[in-house]
Amino acid sequence: MAEPRYRRILLKLSGEALAGKGTHSIDPNMLDYYAEEIERVHRHGVQVAVVLGGGNIWRGNQAIARGMDAAQSHYMGMLATIINALALQDALERRGIFTRAMTAIKMDEVAEPYIRRRATRHLEKGRVIILAAGTGNPYFTTDSAAALRAAEVHAEVILMAKNGVDGVYSADPRRYPDAKRFEYISYMEALSRGLTVMDSTALTFCMDNNIPIIVFDPLTPGNIERIVMGEHVGTLVSSHPSQ
């Protein structure tokens, strides 16, 4: 059997990924789908950390645009990610995968507090960890949380799931059919062109800490497994094409 290309990954999923075709809430079918996708790589002995967004439950920017205090809205978004984390934890545990939900905001009755060494130890023991509540601070996105946690737990790569898009394009392919998809792009070029990889703060952090990012379509079954086994899927964003 082939050996995995990556041994420790961080998977970034948007909250909308769990909503399926709905605009809000959690679709049980999507929970089962992502649990199966994670299980496929877990079987290879790959250590998996997951960071979830909360946009299926709370759209913070829309609330801010209507006048809500920004910090208040951001904290509500953090709570939304915890709901998503508990739902995914349940879906994974029903498949027999030991899973720990860890939160950047303490709520001991619900999940473990995020402690870097404890998170790393869970990974070493073969447990999937779901890292919720972003960074625990307002004004930072879950993209920034993914970058920060990837650095802290020494993930080899961030798998950046983008619903409906199979990589990084020169322009929005849904609006510009002739947009070019990149097989590889450097951090600096992605930043200078303002391309949609992750927010600029998170992307700069990944560049400074040399954390490669693979942007891919998670709705193609088996894509996560293909990536960890070394197949080229989506777009690699890094300092060098062979990273």
Curated annotation (Swiss-Prot):
> Per UniProt, where does ATP bind?
K12, L13, S14, G15, G55, R59, N163, Y169, D172
Q: How is its activity regulated?
A: Inhibited by UTP.
EC number(s) of the enzyme?
Answer: 2.7.4.22
Report which reactions are catalysed by this protein. Answer: UMP + ATP = UDP + ADP
The biological pathway it contributes to is:
Pyrimidine metabolism; CTP biosynthesis via de novo pathway; UDP from UMP (UMPK route): step 1/1
Functional summary from the UniProt entry: Catalyzes the reversible phosphorylation of UMP to UDP.
Its recorded name reads: Uridylate kinase
* Organism, as annotated: Roseiflexus sp. (strain RS-1)
